[in-house]
């Protein structure tokens, strides 16, 4: 009765699942290819006994297979892809179900005696099996009967036989289904002897084994749909469907079959890894793994951005439709924020970290601390797969926020790839500790204060990422790297602000971050490059130096300067490496012309002409699409970092890697205030080249570097003085205008004063003055100016030779003098 049903939980579960399968089967089967196990039985008592065992087995197998999935979401999808169980009680019902899903039958379990044409037929099950065998020679069938004489007929029909009277029928049924319906491990056998040649436990095992399976065994299993059935039972529908559709009729096709299976697995694994943040499992992480996490905490800002990019590539296949170019993110593993918490608490570091100790001392304490032991084996497994230098990047909770910028505040280290894995482990551990320590450096604390955040609430995840590039002797660097923004504050000619802007340079992207002379172009107007519009500009305003990773630097001690093992080299060094082809043009001094392309002799000028104007590499098209997709999906302007390797003798295919995406934070709304006409006599500053927008109130101070007797050799000393002045204004809660010669924030003291953002964080308008006889371009393309625009800080470039520019230095000096006189009289 109903009371007995409620007492038997397994029966109640079977009833619920049977109803669910009846309701969901058609949609799941037709949409994704879910398989069916057909049970043909008319005895209520028997199917009430068998169904609970059947469901228990299928659910347990699905749970086991789900552990092969990359994360919890994928596990849930795998479990939902379990085979559906359909119950038929008559011959006609069984035939109807089979005919409805002939290509989705995983197997059949049938009684022998049940109704056919309205009458009890003692051979109905055998007739149904004969009907099936006419259509499918190899579909697994289990015949169960209380009459042992039916066993001969079962053998004739190539079906398994089970005795209903056996006390161990449930056990026998489970074992038979496990062996014949594709569940459990896959065993490749010798078809002549039955000897097991190889056992495959998962898809990775199959990929690693398939090339060594003998032709006879492979043909035996492949021609009988054994492999596709095994994949179907694990809910790997795309690859199973591909193999099922390919019919092999001769052993001579074994090599073709072998390659088809291998290629299908590779494509399937790449597809499943794309756009998914997998749980790192060292025994499964291999060259087809793309993005994994260690720990249960947050991925941090950059980590979330990378996951966003990876999923965006998956959602927009057009990004991968360029022949000869592969688009992806670098192989990435993220140490989640809970690893940071464990490291800080286990080593009792908060007291040191929150103190006022110098940065060098804080770093020293962190380097002496110990990372969790559980990470060692994971790191070793990671080393076995990457085979390239590793970038150790910060990914804090606050980085790449939609409302506050935290770009370029924390350290990023790069370590070379070494054959000595113990030494590489030491380098990686120190790099991770160095990034953790950078959270508590003085600049970081000052930045947190400026953004009204609390330092001890910051959490740090770490991104371990392959460094994009190629090795050239003892140095390593990509063909080029860059930053693209979907919003361009400096449109020229026919360009519009929403067309975006890209800065690209040979070598590591740090060159752009440090304010080097990168090439600037709009991805919608790649031929419209201001820097190469005249011969003089091309020779004076294009890249002359680049950054590379020093592969001999492993013995160096880690420093608060995260570029301690980077080399700043001349473009001529890259020419010696033979790495510039495709990115440079050649200056002909005799004809006074720059010729697109690489030619022997003559100065090499970094113009990217072959890429931007002659289509050697679809950089502009890909950036245009990526910026558009990113802006649409984030709902605001975005900035994207990238790096690329052009095709060479080692790699025939070009590679474009997206390294990071972040929102361009701009909390100011556009204002319609009319300024009206203002006479130059009433102006202190005026420019025809400005970054930012809006009105800035309550500014009473000007901090400026005098142009008379200015020496760039003093720029480092000037930076320290400005830091002190900024600290004073921070304590007073006041803002100021900052004016000085050259590029603010450049690490090259010949170009400008090497301040960092925390040193000038209270300035509301920053002005860069051109030096005499020195043409200076606006400094776009760095983390520094991302912060300027994000905080609503104005930026002027003033060129004395331009009629649209003005700086009344005499008035500022006079006001400065009067202020001193007033203070003296007081």
Could you say what each language-model-derived stretch is?
Residues 1, 16, 92-99, 114-138:
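Short amphipathic alpha-helix used as the core "switch/output" element in two-component signaling
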Residues 1-4, 41, 106-110, 127-153, ...:
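A short, hydrophobic beta-strand element within the central beta-sheet of small alpha/beta folds
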Residues 2-6, 236, 815-824:
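Conserved small/polar residues in nucleotide/adenosyl-binding loops
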Residues 3, 9-25, 53, 172-182:
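Receiver (REC) domain switch/output surface
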Residues 33-45, 50-75, 85-87:
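Conserved acidic segment of CheY-like receiver
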Residues 65-107:
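Acidic, metal-coordinating helix/loop segments flanking the phosphotransfer/catalytic sites
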Residues 144-293, 311:
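Long, compositionally biased intrinsically disordered regulatory segments in eukaryotic proteins
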Residues 283-321, 370-770:
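Conserved mixed alpha/beta core segments that line enzyme active sites in large multi-domain catalysts
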């Amino acid at each position: 009765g109903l009371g007995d049903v409620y007492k038997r939980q397994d029966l109640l579960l079977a009833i619920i699942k049977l109803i669910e399968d009846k309701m969901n089967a058609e949609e799941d089967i037709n949409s994704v290819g879910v398989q069916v196990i057909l049970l043909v039985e008319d005895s209520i008592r028997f199917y009430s006994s068998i169904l609970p065992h059947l469901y228990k087995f299928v659910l347990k197998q699905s749970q086991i297979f789900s552990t092969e999935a990359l994360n919890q979401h994928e596990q849930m999808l795998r479990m939902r892809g379990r085979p559906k169980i359909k119950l038929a009680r008559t011959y006609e019902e069984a035939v109807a179900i089979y005919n409805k899903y002939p290509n989705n039958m995983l197997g059949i379990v049938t009684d022998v005696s049940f109704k056919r044409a309205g009458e009890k037929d003692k051979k109905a099950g055998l007739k149904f099996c004969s009907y099936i065998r006419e259509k499918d020679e190899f579909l697994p069938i289990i015949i169960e009967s209380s009459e042992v004489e039916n066993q001969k007929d079962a053998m004739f029909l190539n079906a398994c036989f089970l005795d209903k009277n056996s006390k161990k029928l449930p056990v026998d049924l489970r074992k038979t289904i496990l062996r014949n319906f594709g569940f459990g491990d896959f065993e490749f056998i010798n078809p002549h002897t039955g000897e097991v040649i190889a056992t495959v436990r998962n898809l990775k095992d199959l990929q690693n084994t398939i090339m060594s399976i003998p032709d006879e065994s492979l043909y035996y299993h492949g021609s009988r749909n054994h492999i596709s059935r095994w994949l179907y039972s694990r809910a790997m529908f795309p690859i199973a469907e591909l193999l099922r559709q390919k019919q092999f009729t001769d052993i001579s096709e074994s090599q073709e079959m072998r390659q088809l299976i291998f290629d299908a697995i590779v494509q399937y694994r790449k597809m499943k890894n794309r756009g998914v943040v997998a749980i790192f499992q060292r025994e499964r992480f291999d060259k087809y793994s793309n993005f994994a996490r260690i720990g249960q905490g947050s991925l941090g800002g950059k980590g979330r951005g990378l996951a966003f990019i990876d999923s965006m590539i998956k959602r927009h296949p057009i990004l991968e439709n360029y022949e000869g170019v592969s688009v992806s993110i670098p192989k990435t593993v993220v140490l989640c924020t809970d690893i940071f918490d464990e490291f800080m608490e286990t080593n009792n570091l908060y007291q040191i970290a929150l103190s006022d100790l110098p940065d060098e001392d804080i770093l020293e304490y962190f380097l002496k601390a110990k990372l969790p032991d559980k990470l060692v084996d994971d790191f070793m497994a990671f080393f076995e797969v990457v085979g390239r230098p590793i970038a150790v990047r910060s990914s804090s909770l606050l980085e790449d926020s939609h409302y506050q910028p935290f770009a370029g505040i924390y350290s990023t280290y790069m370590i070379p790839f070494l054959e000595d894995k113990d030494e590489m482990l030491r380098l990686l551990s120190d790099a991770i500790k160095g990034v953790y320590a950078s959270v508590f450096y003085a600049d970081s604390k000052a930045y947190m204060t400026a953004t009204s955040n609390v330092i001890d609430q910051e959490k740090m995840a770490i991104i371990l990422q392959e460094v994009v590039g190629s090795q050239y002797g003892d140095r390593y660097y990509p063909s080029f790297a860059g930053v693209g923004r979907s919003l361009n504050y400096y449109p020229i000619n026919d360009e519009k602000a929403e067309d975006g802007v890209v800065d690209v340079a040979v070598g590591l992207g740090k060159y752009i971050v440090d304010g080097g002379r990168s090439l600037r172009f709009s991805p919608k107007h790649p031929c419209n490059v201001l820097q190469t519009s005249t011969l003089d500009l091309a020779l004076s305003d294009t890249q002359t130096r680049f950054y590379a990773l020093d592969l001999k630097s492993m013995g160096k001690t880690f420093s608060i300067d995260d570029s301690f093992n980077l080399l700043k080299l001349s473009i001529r060094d890259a020419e010696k490496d033979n790495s510039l082809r495709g990115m440079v043009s050649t200056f002909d001094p005799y004809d006074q012309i720059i010729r697109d392309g690489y030619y022997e002799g003559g100065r090499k000028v970094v113009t990217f002409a072959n890429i931007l104007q002659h289509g050697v590499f679809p950089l502009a098209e890909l950036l245009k699409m990526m910026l558009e997709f990113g802006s649409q999906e984030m709902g605001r302007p975005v900035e994207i970092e990238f790096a690329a390797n052009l095709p060479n003798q080692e790699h025939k295919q070009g590679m474009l890697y997206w390294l990071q995406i972040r929102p361009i934070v701009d909390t100011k709304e556009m204002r319609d205030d009319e300024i009206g006409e203002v006479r130059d006599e009433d102006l202190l500053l005026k420019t025809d080249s400005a970054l930012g927008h809006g009105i800035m109130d309550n500014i009473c101070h000007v901090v400026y570097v005098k142009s008379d007797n200015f020496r760039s050799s003093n720029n480092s000393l000037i930076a320290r003085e400005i830091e002190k002045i900024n600290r004073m204004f921070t304590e007073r809660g006041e803002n100021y205008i900052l004016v000085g010669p050259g590029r603010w924030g450049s690490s090259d003291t010949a170009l400008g004063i090497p301040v960092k953002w925390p040193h000038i964080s209270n300035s509301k308008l920053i002005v860069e003055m051109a030096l005499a006889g020195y043409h200076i371009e606006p400094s776009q393309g760095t983390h520094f100016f991302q912060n300027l625009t994000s905080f609503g800080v104005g930026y002027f470039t003033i060129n004395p030779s331009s009629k649209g520019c003005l700086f009344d230095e005499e008035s500022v000096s006079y006001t400065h003098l009067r202020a001193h006189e007033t203070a003296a009289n007081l």
